[in-house]
């Protein structure tokens, strides 16, 4: 199949590999991005790539906590300018509070639910769009609960570009829970612990690491030991509790919380626009279009 320049560019952005290496990888894997990433890793050309798409869309993430319930929500706008608008920021907080009050479970149900003003969220969003002059959309939200003996940690980075909500059991130390939320914002783990990693993912990673070691010309008798060592390192990179704590790299996140009598049981991390692609605009073409 013909490999487009756009596909090569996407693979380069995800792996940091050279153009020709990316083109060859895509050719060998029939244009499958995920398989091409594995191909490059097995050849030792690229490190493990987080298979998240480019961060592109604008907007805000907000975390709202009320007693034993907390909500995290992402609302998108078209420009960063609007994301800094006070009216938009108030809208995001209003929606986050309503999510907790209404106990809705899906975005569709949220849009149909009524605010205290009697208007639906959908009507409120349309009002805001009319006032602000940009397309706005509620992309996603999550609700978490805890007991009186636990703590929520809420952290917003860059004014809401990244938002994290943590649930820590066994302690009411909100500051410690917030510190862990800050760690998760910075390091971006995929899981709480290795117990959450599927057997399928572990087996897939083990196979990639094995091929990588064999392609490096390592003797087969030591490959198994190398693979297990690298697999442990991989799990440490993607599991929050096993990572070196960002505020004190001499201890793990698990050890930090254990000293406080707590244990991380859940987290939600939203980054504005992750997995979304921004419309690519050609400025010259845009000007031409306005002159017609």
From Swiss-Prot:
Q: Which Pfam families does the record associate with it?
A: EF_TS (PF00889)
Q: What InterPro entries has UniProt attached to this entry? A: EF-Ts_dimer_sf (IPR036402), Transl_elong_EFTs/EF1B (IPR001816), Transl_elong_EFTs/EF1B_dimer (IPR014039), Transl_elong_Ts_CS (IPR018101), UBA-like_sf (IPR009060)
- The name under which this protein is listed is Elongation factor Ts
The organism's place on the tree of life at top rank? Bacteria
Give a GO molecular function annotation for the protein. translation elongation factor activity
Q: Which residues cross the membrane?
A: none
Chief location of this protein within or outside the cell:
cytoplasm
Question: Where is this chain's protein located in or outside the cell?
Answer: Cytoplasm
| Known role | Associates with the EF-Tu.GDP complex and induces the exchange of GDP to GTP. It remains bound to the aminoacyl-tRNA.EF-Tu.GTP complex up to the GTP hydrolysis stage on the ribosome.
Q: Which UniProt keywords apply?
A: Cytoplasm, Elongation factor, Protein biosynthesis
Q: Which gene encodes it?
A: tsf
Q: Does the keyword Ion transport apply?
A: no
Which SUPFAM superfamilies does the UniProt record give? Elongation factor Ts (EF-Ts), dimerisation domain, UBA-like
Region Involved in Mg(2+) ion dislocation from EF-Tu: which residues? 79-82
Family annotation (PANTHER family): ELONGATION FACTOR TS (PTHR11741), ELONGATION FACTOR TS, MITOCHONDRIAL (PTHR11741:SF0)
GO cellular component terms attached to this protein's record? cytoplasm
> What family is this?
Belongs to the EF-Ts family.
